[in-house]
Amino acid sequence: MNLSAKTVVVIAIGAALYGIGGLPMFGIPVFANTTLKPAMAVLALFSVLYGPIVGFLVGFIGHWVTDLFAGWGVWLTWILGSGIVGMIIGLFPILTKRRIEVGLFDKKDFFIFVVLAFVGNVIGYGTSAFLDTVLYAEPFTKVFAQLCIIAAGNTVLIAVVGYFILTNLAKRKKQSTHLTEAQ
């Protein structure tokens, strides 16, 4: 894997925004060690714009940053989960043939976006919950409850915030593709 300088900078910016935005002071506590983070929209945006590799690395590194600064210790299981979420949402440009880059974002694209957000959260944080149970002997009922709350909450958050961001991004891209040079 050979990443360009631009891609490395994008990953660093995305991870910093996701990591700092994921701190408890910016989240909404909903369950034991479970916080809904508006920063999930940042992860989704970087994943949609730059694809699965960037999405994975922004999620993985960003969650690591959150854990380092939050003071609750580094939970590699949940760090991996955030990486998987970013990777799955990062499939969006591939599945939509990069239509958003030419200013197209319709209901079908939004549906794909929401499904990827849900599937990403279920698989990503489902992996985290499973690994917590196996590696750390966390109670299954607790991690399953965390998974359900996170998957539902994050999907709604990503869908609502993502809709406005991606709709406006598509409008902006559409306007910039119709520019003509003054005569």
Curated annotation (Swiss-Prot):
Protein name: UPF0397 protein VSAL_I1988
Pfam families: ECF-ribofla_trS
Transmembrane segments annotated in the record for this chain: 8-28, 41-61, 74-94, 110-130, 147-167
PANTHER family registered for this protein in UniProt: UPF0397 PROTEIN BC_2624-RELATED, UPF0397 PROTEIN SPR0429
Source organism of the structure: Aliivibrio salmonicida (strain LFI1238) (Vibrio salmonicida (strain LFI1238))
Family according to the record: Belongs to the UPF0397 family.
Keywords on record: Cell membrane, Membrane, Transmembrane, Transmembrane helix
Highest taxon of source: Bacteria
